[in-house]
Amino acid sequence: MIAIVDDDDSLRTAVQDLLEAVGLPAQGFASAEEFLNSGKQHGTACLIADIRMPGMSGLELQAHLNAERCRVPIIFITAHGDEKMRLQARREGAVEFLSKPFDNEVLLDSVRAALES
């Protein structure tokens, strides 16, 4: 299952629909806390997460998963990223960092690469 964690309902739904249209099972979560409370982090094959969200940020979610030794490939998407943020995410193990708006094919290629890693 590919988890999509983003507080933007329309983007989360669009990404879920895109993944499911190419046969990839996906589930959306409105916040990092909702994702963690679902108990599905250890059954997640790939995580697509926004960096900036109310409550726990995407980077804080990444740190939490790393502390739990939950090594899920993470693709970050953000409208407000900078180079420092990108480097921090990569240093902590993110496989990709995409700026919004992103090309659907680039996202799909990133997901496929993450699933193969």
Predicted feature locations:
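Active-site beta3 strand of CheY-like receiver
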Residues: 42-48
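Active-site residues of response regulator receiver
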Residues: 50, 78
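Two-component/phosphorelay signaling modules centered on CheY-like receiver
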Residues: 9-27, 114
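Receiver (REC) domain active-site loop signature in two-component systems and cognate sites
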Residues: 53
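Alpha4 helix (beta4-alpha4-beta5 surface) of REC/receiver domains from two-component response regulators
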Residues: 60, 81-96
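Acidic catalytic/metal-coordinating carboxylates
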Residues: 30-31, 57-60
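C-terminal output helix
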Residues: 84, 102-112
